[in-house]
UniProtKB/Swiss-Prot annotation:
Chain residues that bind Zn(2+): C219, C293, C300, C303
NCBIfam families: PRK02597.1, rpoC2_cyan
Protein name, UniProt field: DNA-directed RNA polymerase subunit beta'
Top-level taxon: Bacteria
Record note on cofactor: Binds 1 Zn(2+) ion per subunit.
Gene3D superfamilies: 1.10.132.30, 1.10.150.390, 1.10.1790.20, 2.40.50.100, RNA polymerase Rpb1, domain 3
Organism for this UniProt entry: Nostoc punctiforme (strain ATCC 29133 / PCC 73102)
Keywords: DNA-directed RNA polymerase, Metal-binding, Nucleotidyltransferase, Transcription, Transferase, Zinc
Length: 1349
């Protein structure tokens, strides 16, 4: 290179410049030489970095001296805000907002200061050099080092209104450090989650786009995409030149002024041409795009444009789908999910502020449309409803009348000055809303609790409560009009339940005076028992015996067996009862206390029970047994039953056989009685063997005796020639020897009508409660019940049951009484213990509470002593609630059924103001802090005036002499401002404790920019999910008319009037804010409210608009609108994070999401309704239908998310390898699908060569190779023939005709292909004639499955 060519450029080469340099070298000189240059640059950099020794020391961190002043100013402003809040001028929310915005502004101002300071004092400062050259770090990190860290968010994402005022150079305080670590932890968690999410996103993207391969040179489409620079508000995110680079022009570009041709159709756009087009001032250019490419199932070379890796036209067979997927997925890890990289530091978009340049007066023109509104800081301002200007009239200096200054205001701006206001230079006039997207800042409804700072009485001032009841019947009280809620100070006592006040409003009470008392009364009366304090039981229980019963003749003995005590009660008539309930336990009404021990009713075996004369209560529980009502005889027919459940082969006797006692009936089972065997078996399993004792009488004539089956024979009756001596039971049996009658013995048990009861004495109160023990006989079995048992059973039990009569107390709240079992010593003989049952009422006395913060202390006195008999309802103990400090009782509500709180107004709660002049206030006025109460005298604290006295008159002197001395007494209070719509949680006049919630303020806050950003937003877009709070889209274009609610400024609906007069209504839901002004013209598909748009809705709106060109044009238009929307939205997210991705990658993915339609009506085609088919395919079939005159298919375009699109590909192998494998494969099998192995994934799974790169078959058609060489030679061979470019890639090899070895006969067979007869101009229907031996090589080209239609 000669010296004449040397150009010296004197500029700083920072990160951006380096990038441009390398990109230029790469485009112009190829890979190898660029690599060498990059290497040299690296050496250069390292050499000088080493020489300079740039490093950061603590001294390099220079803190701007203005920091202190800035912080002081901010703190001053916040103090002022705090005062306004204390005075009730702004709500809690407005205070919070103001604090946050103040700190935010300060932080930003400080950041600018830092930069200025560095530039002024030391531009070679190493921190400054590093950050601003782009080597390491960025401005926000520098800000944290030398400015202030600023506001942080807590784990819930709420901003903490305590900023970190220090930086890392000064060091953080402990509090600041802890607040900092919130954000840091969040960042770590986020990174961990993000990598996983991002990886999965990449996987889905690859899956949806893996079969997009460049398969043609030119699809010949005339459609294209109109591209302009990408802007957000006034800021250009991506300039036009950048977006054009590497594209192919779709329509000739003509210079807007000279009308000369800049670039022709189908020419690629290198960097210089892109710059030239941008300079010429062309606003938008039509380019070819993968979105509009008409190649079937692929993208053609012209529509894709450059391969960005080589800055050359893309090759045939390039797998652009995979490249696109990776280009979008890879930066995913850099996208934030929630927090910013700065460790949770809050960054907010500050609106652009307009400050006055001069001193002067504000003049607002008449035609400027404004309405007053309250800003989020609680200040009054004007909202500009339509674009306009305001004038500043400068203050006259001398005779010169200077020019008026104009300030332009856009719709949505906020004016902080009013007509006629005087302003100083530098004063804030307005905040201009930034145009574009930021005006649709997403707001969300949020609520904030306001808790009371002091205890006292609630008083509403100007607040108008309004009650609403929802469908569930819950009532909410909201403030219809905003205003103040006052809490007037006083000590509030919470009274325990059941307490009765002993004072009334206005009473004076001394410290420790009684406010209220609770009485503890006995319900039933009786004898008082005060138990001694045992370790387990405290004396706070009082027992009152209401009734008792004693077994006076019976003695109780205790038998211990195996560690368990058995209590036996022996009565005078030699009966022994076993106690079923142990002493010290409670017994319920009707429970068994004891059971008689006797053996008279025991049987020896199981058997059959019949009643003779015995009657039992019908409704008995089988578990407890049946109570005997009337005595009689029980007849018991014994039989012996063995339950076996073994195999039938073990049976040693047969059914009906007579056996002697001791015979082995089943292996290891012997019978105990002689009798007839009855065997029950099922499925060769022996269930049971029953031996029925008795005598067997053989009969000859079965008919004559069949009537005697199951009857009794009385003693003395003659039967079958024998005279019976006792009662027998006759049964007919079939024995192996023949029919016979079995005469079975019967055992009789006599049951008396009433069992004898041990004697008792009972004591009962006059209340009519009585208690007694009753003896009951119970039978465990029913009449004719078979009892299976080998051992004996007990047929009758005699039990003692407790009975408590509750007279006149059928109401359920009288608890079911229980009796206590006790052992008492006999009065005459202390050795003997008697059994006593008592009914106790036990009352618990409250503990004495020493003064609790909210309750006052309590004191309890006992009114009874041990052994005293009391009447029902008498008071046993009373608890008094004492007042802590003296004062006046207030706030006792009349008429409310139970008083839960009362208030004592103490001296501490009052404040006296002395004034020598006549007061301006009257009793009952509510004053906020700083109000003038008399000329020159101001209220030191907020409160309510309770008294105004003339001191002289009060002292009893002549009032005429000194009227100059007034005393104003106020009751300290605290105002809280309530915004309209807030939910009230208290009522006027309520008493509240400190910390009780007063109201829920409902407010709208701008969502922090990063709530749904980054990955989640990209996922939402690519999965085509409906956004949570979507905006309302205009369905048809027209003029906007805003409908306001009656109350005034809140818009409740939008009407759009079309040109032909049709009106469409759009009601506004809660939290939806208008972004179109009244009277403006909107287009179809334009958002009317803020929030993200729903892509499905965009598609539907444009499809339903219709067009003259038929359904295909209509669907194409709708799809194109949605495609551009998606591409731009995805770009927005990446741009907001400073990541550059070429549009074409996103377009490839979006193309895959939007190439299907849902068939509504198949017409005469073979397609079914609901089927998802490619748009181009349907259109092809429809064209065929049009020729034959059949009915066309009707369809609706659909937008599929990437997961759904992957599962709906033509290739079932690819879909199955992605998700839901079994479902995909079974459905494919049922439908008999075939897979044409078009994509990469299918081929990898089957194990074939993939149809991309070297595996792509360029030589399908003779002559293709020649076109191909011509195609690329023009664009590639400009500077490649340079010996330095050592990298030899396939492209250059092909151009130099270094033929890559093709496979011979041994490979896939020779590939002979001819164009088919059906060859069509637009190449949509192309068919291959394939050799028979070419079966493995499936039709790879754009072969279509519908040729035979």
């Amino acid at each position: 290179m000669t010296n004449e060519k040397m150009i010296f450029r004197n500029r700083v080469v920072d990160k951006g410049q380096l990038r441009n340099l390398i990109s230029w070298a790469f485009t112009n000189y190829g890979t190898a030489r660029t690599a060498v240059m990059a290497d040299k640059l690296k050496d250069l950099g390292f050499r000088y970095a080493t020489k300079a020794g740039v490093s950061i020391s603590v001294d390099d961190l220079m803190i701007p001296p203005t920091k202190r002043l800035l912080l002081e100013a901010a703190e001053e402003e916040i103090r002022a805000t705090e005062t306004r809040y204390q005075r009730g001028e702004i709500t809690e929310v407005e205070r919070f907002q103001k604090v946050i915005d103040t700190w935010n502004g300060t932080s930003e101002a400080l950041k600018d200061e830092v930069v200025v300071h560095f530039k002024k004092t030391n531009p070679l400062n190493s921190v400054y050099m590093m950050a601003f050259s782009g080597a390491r770090g960025n401005i926000s990190q520098v800000r944290q080092l030398v400015g202030m860290r600023g506001l942080m968010a807590d784990p819930q994402g709420e901003i903490i209104d305590l900023p970190i005022k220090t930086n890392f150079r000064e060091g953080l305080t402990v509090t600041e450090y802890i607040i900092s670590s919130y954000g840091a932890r969040k960042g770590l968690v986020d990174t961990a989650l993000r990598t996983a999410d991002s990886g999965y996103l990449t996987r889905r993207l690859v899956d949806v786009s893996q079969d997009v391969i460049i398969r043609e040179f030119d699809c010949g489409t005339t459609r294209g995409l109109t591209i302009g620079p990408m802007t957000e508000g006034a800021k250009t995110l991506i300039p036009l030149a950048t977006r054009l680079m590497g594209r192919v022009i779709g329509e000739d570009v003509v210079h807007p002024v000279t009308k000369e041709l800049i670039a022709a159709r189908n020419s690629p756009i290198p960097e210089d041409l892109a710059k030239k087009i941008e300079k010429s001032g062309v606003g938008e250019v039509v380019v070819r795009s993968p979105l509009t490419c008409e190649a079937a199932r692929s993208v053609c070379q012209h529509c894709y444009g450059w391969s960005l890796a080589h800055a050359k036209m893309v090759d045939l067979g390039e797998a652009v789908g995979i490249i696109a997927a990776q280009s979008i997925g890879e930066p995913g890890t850099q996208l934030t999910m929630r927090t910013f990289h700065t460790g949770g530091v809050f960054t907010g978009e500050v609106a652009q502020q307009v400050r006055s340049k001069i001193d002067g007066t504000v003049k607002l023109p008449r035609k400027l449309k404004t309405r007053t509104y309250r800003t989020r800081h609680g200040e009054d301002a004007l909202y500009v409803e339509a674009n306009g200007i305001m004038l500043l009239e400068p203050t006259k200096v001398g005779d010169v009348t200077p020019e008026n200054q104009e300030v332009h205001l856009t719709q949505g701006s906020t004016l902080y000055v009013f007509d006629g206001n005087k302003v100083k230079q530098g004063q804030l006039l307005a905040e201009v809303a930034l145009g574009g997207r930021t005006t649709r800042t997403n707001t969300e409804k949020a609520v904030k609790d306001v808790a009371s700072d002091l205890a006292g009485e609630v008083q509403f001032a100007e607040v108008v409560p309004e009650q609403k009841t929802d469908r569930q019947g819950n009532t909410t009280t909201t403030a219809a009009r905003g205003g103040l809620i006052w809490i007037l100070s006083g000590e509030v006592y919470n009274l325990p339940p059941g307490a009765e006040l002993v004072v009334k409003n206005g009473d004076a009470i001394a410290a420790n005076g009684v406010l209220a008392e609770t009485k503890l009364a006995s319900l039933h009366g009786g004898v008082v028992r005060l138990p001694e304090a045992t370790p387990g039981k405290s004396t706070r229980e009082i027992e009152i015996i209401t009734a008792s019963v004693v077994l006076d003749q019976a003695t109780v003995t205790v038998q211990s067996s195996q560690g368990r005590n058995n209590y036996l009660v022996s009565t005078g008539n030699n009966q022994v009862f076993n106690l079923r309930a142990t002493p010290g336990t409670k017994v319920q009404n009707g429970q068994v206390v004891a059971e008689l021990i006797d053996d008279r009713y025991r049987t020896t075996t199981g058997g059959f029970l019949k009643f003779a004369g015995v009657e039992v209560q019908k409704k008995g529980k089988a578990k407890l047994g049946y109570e005997v009502v009337q005595g009689g005889t029980l007849l018991w027919i014994p039989e012996e039953s063995h339950e076996v459940n073994k195999d039938i082969s073990l049976l040693l006797v047969e059914d009906g056989q007579f056996v002697e006692a001791g015979t082995e009936v089943v292996k290891d089972i012997f019978c105990q009685n002689s009798g007839v065997v009855e065997v029950t078996q099922k499925n060769d399993i022996l269930r049971e063997v029953v031996v029925k004792p008795g005598e067997l009488l053989m009969v000859d004539d079965p008919e004559s005796v069949i009537g005697r089956d199951n009857t009794f024979i009385q003693p003395g009756e003659e039967f079958q020639g024998n005279v019976a001596t006792e009662l027998r039971y006759i049964q007919y049996v079939e024995t192996p020897e023949g029919p016979a009658l079995l005469s079975r013995p019967v055992v009789e048990f006599a049951v008396p009508d009433n069992p004898d009861v041990p004697s008792t004495t009972s004591v009962s109160q006059q209340t009519g409660r009585s208690i007694q023990l009753r003896a009951v006989q119970r039978l465990p079995y029913k009449d004719s019940e078979r009892v299976k048992s080998v051992e004996g059973v007990e047929l009758l039990r005699t039990q003692l049951v407790l009975e408590i009569e509750q007279e006149g107390e059928q109401d359920h709240n009288a608890s079911p009484l229980a009796a206590d079992i006790e052992l008492v010593e006999d009065t005459e003989n202390p050795e003997v213990q008697r059994l006593q049952l008592v009914i106790l009422e036990s009352l618990v006395i409250r503990r004495d509470i020493t003064a609790d913060a909210t309750q006052g202390s309590t004191q309890t006195t006992l009114e009874v002593y041990d052994g005293l008999t009391i009447a029902p309802g008498s008071v046993v103990a009373r608890t008094q609630i004492l007042c802590k400090e003296g004062g006046e009782v207030r706030g006792v509500r009349k008429g409310t059924e139970n008083v839960r709180r009362c208030l004592v107004l103490r001296d501490v709660d009052r404040l006296t103001i002395n004034t020598s002049t006549q007061p301006k206030v009257k009793v009952g006025d509510l004053l906020v802090e700083g109000t003038e109460v008399a000329p020159g005298v101001f209220a030191p604290e907020s409160g309510q005036v309770v008294d105004i006295k003339n001191a002289a008159a009060a002292s009893g002197g002549e009032s005429a002499l000194s009227t100059k001395n007034y005393v104003i007494t106020t009751r300290i209070g605290r105002p809280y401002r309530v915004s309209p719509g807030a939910v009230l949680q208290i009522e006027d006049g309520d008493l509240v404790q400190r910390g009780d919630n007063l109201v829920l303020l409902v407010f709208e806050r701008a969502k922090t920019g990063d709530i749904i950003q980054g990955l989640p937003r990209i996922e939402e877009l690519l999965e085509a999910r409906k956004p949570k709070e979507a905006c309302i889209l205009c369905r048809r274009g027209g003029e906007v008319k805003v409908v306001y609610a009656e109350s005034g400024d809140e818009a409740i609906a939008i009407k759009v009037v079309e040109s032909n007069g049709v009106v469409t209504d759009y009601p506004l839901g809660p939290g939806q804010n208008l972004i179109v002004p009244d009277g403006s013209i909107v287009l179809a598909g334009q958002p009317l409210t803020d929030g993200p748009s729903n892509p499905h809705e965009i598609l539907e709106i444009f499809f339903s608009l219709g067009s003259e060109d038929g359904i295909y044009a209509c669907a194409s238009l709708a799809l194109q609108k949605v495609q551009t929307f998606l591409v731009n939205e995805v770009q927005m997210v990446y741009q907001s994070q400073g990541i550059d991705i070429s549009d074409k990658h996103i377009e490839v993915i979006v193309r895959q999401m939007t190439n299907k339609v849902r068939i509504d009506d198949g017409g005469d085609t073979t397609m079914l309704p609901g089927e998802l088919v490619e748009l181009r395919q349907v259109e092809q079939v429809n064209e065929a239908m049009a020729i034959t005159g059949g009915a066309r298919a009707q369809y609706t375009p659909v937008l599929l998310g990437i997961t759904k699109a992957s599962l709906n590909t033509d290739s079932f192998i690819s879909a199955a390898s992605f998700q839901e494998t079994t479902r995909v494969l079974t459905e494919a099998a049922i439908e008999g699908k075939s897979d044409w192995l078009r994509g990469l994934k299918e081929n990898v799974i089957i194990g074939r060569l993939i149809p991309a790169g070297t595996g792509y078959n360029t030589y399908e058609e003779p002559g293709a190779i020649d076109d191909y060489a011509a195609e690329i030679s023009s664009s590639v061979l400009d500077e490649v023939d340079d010996p330095l470019d050592m990298v030899l890639d396939d492209r250059t090899a092909r151009t130099y005709n270094l033929d890559s070895p093709t496979l011979g006969e041994s490979g896939f067979g020779s590939r002979r292909a001819e164009r088919s007869v059906l060859d069509d101009e637009d190449e949509l229907i192309a068919d291959e004639v394939v050799d028979d031996d070419d079966f493995e090589e499936e039709e790879e080209d754009d072969e279509d499955d519908f040729d035979d239609e």
